[in-house]
Amino acid sequence: MKIAVIGQSLFGQEVYCQLRKEGHEVVGVFTIPDKDGKADPLGLEAEKDGVPVFKFPRWRARGQALPEVVAKYQALGAELNVLPFCSQFIPMEVINAPRHGSIIYHPSLLPRHRGASAINWTLIHGDKKGGFTIFWADDGLDTGDLLLQKECEVLPDDTVSTLYNRFLFPEGIKGMVQAVRLIAEGTAPRCPQSEEGATYEGIQKKETAKINWDQPAEAIHNWIRGNDKVPGAWTEACGQKLTFFNSTLNTSGLSTQGEALPIPGAHRPGVVTKAGLILFGNDDRMLLVKNIQLEDGKMMPASQFFKGSASSDLELTEAELATAEAVRSSWMRILPNVPEVEDSTDFFKSGAASVDVVRLVEEVKELCDGLELENEDVYMATTFRGFIQLLVRKLRGEDDESECVINYVEKAVNKLTLQMPYQLFIGGEFVDAEGSKTYNTINPTDGSVICQVSLAQVSDVDKAVAAAKEAFENGLWGKINARDRGRLLYRLADVMEQHQEELATIEALDAGAVYTLALKTHVGMSIQTFRYFAGWCDKIQGATIPINQARPNRNLTLTKKEPVGVCGIVIPWNYPLMMLSWKTAACLAAGNTVVIKPAQVTPLTALKFAELTLKAGIPKGVVNILPGSGSLVGQRLSDHPDVRKIGFTGSTEVGKHIMKSCALSNVKKVSLELGGKSPLIIFADCDLNKAVQMGMSSVFFNKGENCIAAGRLFVEESIHNQFVQKVVEEVEKMKIGNPLERDTNHGPQNHEAHLRKLVEYCQRGVKEGATLVCGGNQVPRPGFFFQPTVFTDVEDHMYIAKEESFGPIMIISRFADGDVDAVLSRANATEFGLASGVFTRDINKALYVSDKLQAGTVFINTYNKTDVAAPFGGFKQSGFGKDLGEAALNEYLRIKTVTFEY
């Protein structure tokens, strides 16, 4: 068909392009005149294609059509007028001229919300359904016969922009094309509009957008979102006109502590809180407003209303003003359809796309001597004013982290001045626990108090979960693409590496880790873990699946892997940073947010890690850390309805309780890495020296505080005595001492209660008849030091043969030469199945044993050889689920199946 397109905007441009792709001949485009030298996108596109473009300032005068305008239109010979978005009044002489008449797009479900502000009124009235109508133009106001309608659900927090961008724009374009197709085929319906339920509302203007406070909270919320962003719902307060944006009724778990904001006519004063401005309806229900615009046009987070915005108040130097103007020119080049880049100009609302973000970052790099901005910097400061403030702060060397106040405990240790945060970390801020409750964390080397640490309460858990949920659902973390998320995790690994000596020193101070080991393992593997999973971020993908076709139609099924949401991670005390990293890296790579409960006795590296997330630019609320007791913090995380996954490493007893709580609360996804009694089988045909070396490591590594420590060594009869002799010789060479000394092999146990359990464990072994070859007692010196211990003649029925010590205690049992199946039966006679090992030169025997051992990991002629790429996790009552490797990602993802029919 020959079509005349009458209208404007990006919407009109897209409709025009799609009609041409359909093969229609657009004989002319009628759009608005250029404004400040800038042409409308529809006109620009048509001019590129050589289509005649007309820019009449008006079509009629004194109620009569202008003859010269009508003549130019009629000369085109259009068969159909398409009006995708038109702000001009088109005379009926033009509307009725084509053979097929004229069709108009209207952004509501007619006959409801006739008039120019249809989207606004859809939201203001709280309609549950929205949509658009394409109708045949007549001489009434949106009263013509219906051709096509499509509807969508209106979400509780939808605004004009979100509803338009999500549905009305993309589906409206398709709808216009479909309508023209129906007309061309001769099947387009003409359904008279019913007057039943018809409404007409006037155009929303600033003067009519004042908030009426004498109504319920939901009505106030609908008014605010219905006027967001234009014209903006406003009220008078503090002697000026305040305009509110970004309203929500989702206020669960929100604290009302803050500073009162008196509002004339309101049922109750508003409250400025850390989350934003809480408002109340006349029904005493709350709503939350996140952004406020002042009378001078300045936009700020509502939470900063009484503080002002430091970034907005920066006074620029002459050089910085010159840079700002150069950047303004860059914005003008990127946004050709914006008449003028003003302070309030929004980069994305002005038509910028993700490719333009890359361009802006690169242009700024050239303008500012190589200054490296990140893509997410643009997303966090979308207005020109905000972007310039962010840019100037970067140029001055001021980081966002400076806005976060961090209180430290400082200690001069290991030739370093340690700065250790000691408060809870919630929503990107270090805060006191409810009631300012604290507890002492102890240095196991001498039993002294390192510092007092905030002790999280149940209400603190609720706040942290709310912060994580907000970051997941509405924050930057859920909006950036996977590759940018990976870049942030790479940066976090780099920041951790820059602070590795400090982290290792804190591990030695708080957990008793030998410094040289902590540097390589506790911290080194933590860094490797974040780097490994950073690389996975943009490689998480689903599959396409062939299914039976619904003939004569066809089907396509695909799967998507999605983050589960807010995750709770509960970590043990033996590797405070490494266990945090094993779980958190996979969790974040999958796109989740997290609330972490470090072990109560070892909180300090986790809190230092929290500080490093700020330095790395991880958005606020993505990571939250709560030192505290398992009975309060761990239990509340397990019970919380907004937590969708728990990852736990710890005892089997506690793991069972967590699993039960997860089931009873909301059937959370759960992964458990629990107790172990890992068998190590040493055959006579092994490399004995290597077996001794690795056997020592399998038990005494990290003072025996090792999940996969060899809980029981089975040594073949013919080499048993020689093996024991060599082990004792090696034990005698071990230096027990201060973990910060570089030649120390064996540091203190993690905490006093654990030390006492090890003493009792050894006493029970002796009482039951096992031979104590060496050790078995506390070292006579200050601190929680325990002697490396060796037991022999351990029988299968003994307590120490069945139960985990989690300490530096080697349990040795003999087995008859050549009796492979018997020793396998003994090795598997346990409810645990975390790890295992075998030493032999016979590859056939090694593979046979590895097949039969009931454990998640089998080491052959080595031990403790974990790697970030190798899945780690147990069988039986050692738990289920995996840390590390690609398999770990699946613990923090859910699979969605999508099926199409076409």
From Swiss-Prot:
Region (Aldehyde dehydrogenase domain) location: 417-902
Post-translational modification: Phosphopantetheinylation at Ser-354 by AASDHPPT is required for the formyltetrahydrofolate dehydrogenase activity.
GO molecular function annotation: aldehyde dehydrogenase (NAD+) activity; aldehyde dehydrogenase (NADP+) activity; aldehyde dehydrogenase [NAD(P)+] activity; formyltetrahydrofolate dehydrogenase activity; protein-containing complex binding
Location(s) in or outside the cell: Cytoplasm, Cytosol
Major localisation: cytoplasm
Superkingdom in the source lineage: Eukaryota
Gene Ontology biological process terms in this record: 10-formyltetrahydrofolate catabolic process; folic acid metabolic process; NADPH regeneration; one-carbon metabolic process; tetrahydrofolate biosynthetic process
Database matches in InterPro entries: 10_FTHF_DH (IPR011407), ACP-like_sf (IPR036736), Ald_DH/histidinol_DH (IPR016161), Ald_DH_C (IPR016163), Ald_DH_CS_CYS (IPR016160), Ald_DH_CS_GLU (IPR029510), Ald_DH_N (IPR016162), Aldehyde_DH_dom (IPR015590)
Enzyme Commission code: 1.5.1.6
Pfam name, any one: Formyl_trans_C
Region (Hydrolase domain): 1-310
Phosphoserine found at: S9, S629, S631, S825
Carrier domain sequence ranges: 318-395
Keywords: Acetylation, Cytoplasm, NADP, One-carbon metabolism, Oxidoreductase, Phosphopantetheine, Phosphoprotein
Protein name: Cytosolic 10-formyltetrahydrofolate dehydrogenase
Sites marked Essential for catalytic activity: D142
Residues carrying O-(pantetheine 4'-phosphoryl)serine: S354
UniProt source species: Rattus norvegicus (Rat)
Class of the enzyme per the UniProt entry, highest EC level: oxidoreductase
Keyword Cell membrane: no
Annotated family: In the N-terminal section; belongs to the GART family.
Amino-acid positions noted as binding (6R)-10-formyltetrahydrofolate in the UniProt annotation, renumbered to this chain: Q88, F89, I90, D142
